[in-house]
Amino acid sequence: MAYGYSYASCPSVIIPAVGINIDAKDICGALRIDNNRLWSRTPDRGDVVVFRHPVSGRDYIKRLTGLPGDRVQMKDGVLHINDVAVGLVDGGVFEELKASQGPLRATPRCENAPVGTGGICNKSRQIETLPNGVAHGILNIGSQQMDNTPVFTVPPAHFFFMGDNRDNSTDSRRRQQEGGVGFVPFENLIGRADLIVFSSAGRSMLFFWTWRSDRFFKSVE
């Protein structure tokens, strides 16, 4: 584990059919003391991180954009860290099919809307460069509410996360009380995501016709 071990490193075991609901805190609760982690190191800005939501307990995967003490703000769709805008250059157009995806059957939102089911959904792609030099692609579909935010000051031992699909992401830009992610404590980090082993657009992994083989065993950028 890139960041050591905490209670969040343990799995939750949920089998509704037989009444089993064992939370990770029940298995590794002894590690949940004062943000403690075993054999830990500090995450780097730009890491793609799997973490446990502080309220719902669900696993999320987002990019770490704010470290403890950072001031993070969005202005007109541009990320600002400690009052300085990050680097941003054009990265072309991202295309995908307008179709239901994943277990929740979510349909992508398109910059070229309206797009019918089965049509090509376009999103603007940009390359964002963070203060430490990490460059990665982000997607935008136009002016959105979260393109302008107040200043978020990251508390000690907490982190600020954002999705690369900026206009279709539930992340730290929205407070936990509003259904967002908010600030995530260090103890809730599970690990760094380095490799996509498997990808599917279907409701179940068994629906082989929805597998996205072009994404199998690809490095996470």
Regions found by a protein language model. Name each.
Residues 1-221:
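Soluble "head" domains of membrane/secretory-pathway proteins
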